[in-house]
Regions:
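Extracytoplasmic/secreted cell-surface and envelope-processing proteins
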Residues: 59-63, 91-93, 121-127, 135, ...
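Bacterial N-terminal signal peptides
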Residues: 9-18
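Boundary/activation segment at the start of structured domains
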Residues: 18, 22-109, 187-195, 246-253
Length: 253
């Protein structure tokens, strides 16, 4: 059943693939006709594989976000959850070697990757080893570990729109970024419990049915929060949705 559903969705990808592959990180939404015609794709919660990464421990917000997210998705029925942290004793150490190995690992019928840390236009910061995970390295790791399976990637960091590259825009993927390539994100100070983006993502998790709905609701939440707090140069969260994942449901939904 899963293979047949994915095959039907790949046909839709041929319609929207050119559009998705020729735009910059300010992604336009999929055409309404593509979303409307895409059948709902539901993967059993116990067939999802999750990789959660807190890349830095200079603020408690990063570990807090990952710890809470782990509890939430476990409550949704996800069992294969691997956590990486820059803080010893809170999970496997989030250095480039460990995170790369976790992303390369295969298994399950769908992949969920959530990474929160600092970042710049070259990639995602991993404090252990003071290394950067680049967009090309993430794309290659996902290609090997997740292949053509439905894949959802969230990068919660400054300038994280840099991960929505042409090679990464594949029909089976959803890529969610907390900020545009030329923008910073907020809420990673020593006094923050969560980053702004992580806070909104967690707040919107219960009300969404599909990953696309969750990303759009989170973006709206971030915009409202930044306006309320008087942020002058907003983060502008980004979203890419591959046509084969247009109506991919969250685990347990």
């Amino acid at each position: 059943m899963f293979a047949q559903s994915l095959a039907r969705l790949v046909l839709l990808a041929l319609v929207a693939g050119v559009l998705a592959g020729c735009t910059n990180s300010d992604e336009p939404p999929l055409p309404a006709s593509v979303v409307a015609n895409a059948p709902a794709l539901s993967i059993p919660a116990n067939r999802w594989r999750a990789v959660l990464v807190a890349g830095d421990n200079s603020s408690p917000a990063f570990d807090n976000g990952i710890d809470t997210l782990r509890e939430r998705i476990a409550g949704m029925g996800v069992r294969a959850i691997t956590v990486y942290s820059a803080s010893p004793g809170r999970g496997q150490l989030s250095n480039l070697r460990n995170v790369g190995a976790g992303l390369h690992a295969s298994g399950g019928d769908a992949c969920f990757v959530y990474m929160t840390s600092h970042g710049d236009q070259s990639g995602f910061f991993l404090r252990p080893g003071r290394q950067m995970l680049s967009p090309s390295a993430l794309d290659q790791a996902l290609s090997q570990g997740c292949g053509e399976r439905p894949t959802v990637v969230v990068v919660s960091a400054c300038h994280s729109g840099t991960f929505i590259t042409p090679p990464a825009r594949r029909p089976n993927r959803i890529i969610i970024a907390a900020a545009a390539t030329d923008r910073t994100s907020f809420g990673c100070g020593a006094d923050n419990d969560y980053t702004y983006y992580d806070q909104c993502f967690l707040q919107q998790l219960d009300g969404a049915s599909t990953w696309r709905e969750l990303a759009e609701a989170t973006r709206s939440c971030v915009q409202t929060l930044e306006q309320r707090l008087g942020v002058r140069r907003e983060s502008r969260p980004q979203l890419f949705v591959g046509a084969a994942a247009a109506n991919l449901k969250l685990p347990g939904r």
